[in-house]
Amino acid sequence: MSDAVIELQNVVKKYDKIAVVNNLSLEVKKGEIFGFLGPNGAGKSTSINMMVGLLKPTSGNILFNGKDSSYLDEKEIGICPQDVVLWNNLTCFENLYMIGKMYDIPKKTLKERILVILEKLHLTDKKDELVSSLSGGMKRRMNIAMATIHNPSVVVLDEPSEGLDPQSRRLLWDYILHQKELGHTVILTTHLMDEADMLSDRVAIIDHGQLLKLDTPKKLKQIIGNGDTVQLELDNSEDNTKIINKLKGISDLNNIFEADEKIILVLLDAVKKLPDIIHLVESNDSKIVDISIRQNTLEDVFIELTGRQLRE
């Protein structure tokens, strides 16, 4: 028996004969955080809107728990749109109470649930304040609270961190991970590499309405090879050519070159090899003034697959 909550089978969506989603087939598994990663206009939002029944595909099939999605019970889905949708003239508590009553949540249960959600999203002290007085980050958190007040089994988040500062983003991520702890399935669209990498169990990289790759973040990054990027800046850039020639003997080196007067190395287990790199540089009468290491990112994968950066 399949563990897929949502299944797309050769789904196409066209507007004026232009395919914005083109022959998309994938499965979202129960209890996972599933990320759609791609630039704006890639077809991410259209795909999730079809998944939850807000749009009908031009062709293809969409199944929810093995059944045609037209039979979907709206109480099973919580949707957090990219745009903030709140009643500005009501308090935070009143917003959640109103939406909870629409889902027929018993009064006592609803009040208790509102307090828990506000605490989880660090909004307890804003409970009785008008939504219109909240900051942008707080409104984003309220948006997710509204989408999850009825305890849906599937939570859909469209660009949840758009425009947020790092602190608000971290609070939002913690709440998304909490949804997984509750056993819920989370589907999110994002163009932020760190968000997709940090949160997602699996990531679908999508561009021009087509699925390019689908796998775990770790396996996706292995597409461009197992390795780290080391950047060296010497006190005298005229030594770069000499040092590059010396560093070519480092084991597991995949690439080495000069860029912006810095030396760039791509190699396996870079952290373990740092002492050897530093020793080799210093033993050749050069001095390192700056050194950094970073791992391959999902944006590197996107560049490998499309030949361009994610935000282009």
Placement of each model-derived feature along the sequence:
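ABC transporter nucleotide-binding domain
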Residues: 174-268
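Conserved ABC ATPase "signature" region
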Residues: 97, 101, 108-126
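Conserved ABC ATPase signature
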Residues: 130-134
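Catalytic Walker B motif of ABC-type/P-loop ATPase nucleotide-binding domains
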Residues: 155-158
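Conserved ABC transporter NBD signature motif
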Residues: 60-75
